[in-house]
Amino acid sequence: MTLPRSLRWTGDHLDLLDQRCLPHTVVYRQLTHWREVSEAIRSMAVRGAPAIGVAAAWGVVLAAKAGDDLDQAIEGLRASRPTAVNLSWALNRMQTSAKSNGWVDVHQLERLASAIEAEDRALTQALVNHGVGVLPEDCRVLHHCHTGAVATAGVGTALGVIVAGHQRGIVKHAWLDETRPRLQGAALSAWELGCCGVPATVIVDGASGLLMRRGQVDVVLVGCDRVAGNGDVANKIGTYNLALAARAHGVPFYVCAPSSSIDITTVDGDAITIEERPEDEITHFRGELVCASGVRAWNPAFDITPAHLITGLITEFGVIRSPSRESIASLPFAN
């Protein structure tokens, strides 16, 4: 089965795959205003750090076509989700381009948004090619959240490595954390691997340590929303727990990090803003209260995994073993 594209630019509007409707229904939303793009990012109709960066770039194009204040549109899009650096990465490029002539060149912005989308396709493919090289033969991979094709404009990051590894006869099985509270692993990763013919089993997030203890995990692969200059990683809540369990059981722990997710200007993980989402994502399920009435919930969307727990960062340039400030600063884009 061919996976649907995460987004499609038509020339006058953005068709956006609504990931909230997956896995049961494929629905595209027709977005004609940058505020609609911002709301789609905030509500997680589009999610995955690379995908939201590309979507935001097209949001700027929509603002330019409408004659809206571009600075206001860019800052509105930037505020939609604060943790993933891909969002600011794309918006900063669009803002620089918009100001380069002293006037708004809509066609120039459209070409740049198209280039950002094409770059994501190319760099995710390069990342996947490098990632397959770290996999042991006949391996069982544990994955957290969702990092597949619909979370990018291309083939995905960590999940893309799993798919490619299976196609090459290296990956035997994938374990998928369900990833509370939004269930991206159960709803999206399981669906995507099923479409690609990869054998997979969904587990509750708390089962990963037991799997490792029993020797049923050979490698952990995750994505990221931001890598700080020292190698600390912000990723979906629960990633830090996985890294601790992997270290305790001697399981390699790799983070797939395209250069658009690496922020050398952020000193370390403590400097990364962690998005906190609504309490009802935890207290309610499909609109029904599942907690005792009046119980409060804390819902950070991300956590920080320190660099010393990471076996390697898989980038489009290659694999950075034991990431550090020095090794990240040596990457081509950092100079």
UniProtKB/Swiss-Prot annotation:
Site described as Transition state stabilizer, located at 145
Catalytic residues in the record: 225 (proton donor)
Q: Which domain of life is it from?
A: Bacteria
InterPro entries per the record?
Answer: IF-2B-related, IF-M1Pi, IF_2B-like_C, Initiation_fac_2B_a/b/d, M1Pi_N, NagB/RpiA_transferase-like
Family matches, as Pfam families: IF-2B (PF01008)
Q: Which GO terms describe its molecular function?
A: S-methyl-5-thioribose-1-phosphate isomerase activity
One of the GO BP terms on file: L-methionine salvage from methylthioadenosine
List the catalysed reactions. 5-(methylsulfanyl)-alpha-D-ribose 1-phosphate = 5-(methylsulfanyl)-D-ribulose 1-phosphate
What is this enzyme's EC?
5.3.1.23
What is this protein's function per UniProt?
Answer: Catalyzes the interconversion of methylthioribose-1-phosphate (MTR-1-P) into methylthioribulose-1-phosphate (MTRu-1-P).
Q: Which HAMAP family does the annotation name?
A: Salvage_MtnA
Protein family per UniProt? Belongs to the eIF-2B alpha/beta/delta subunits family. MtnA subfamily.
What's the protein called, per UniProt?
A: Methylthioribose-1-phosphate isomerase
- Species per Swiss-Prot/TrEMBL record: Synechococcus sp. (strain CC9902)
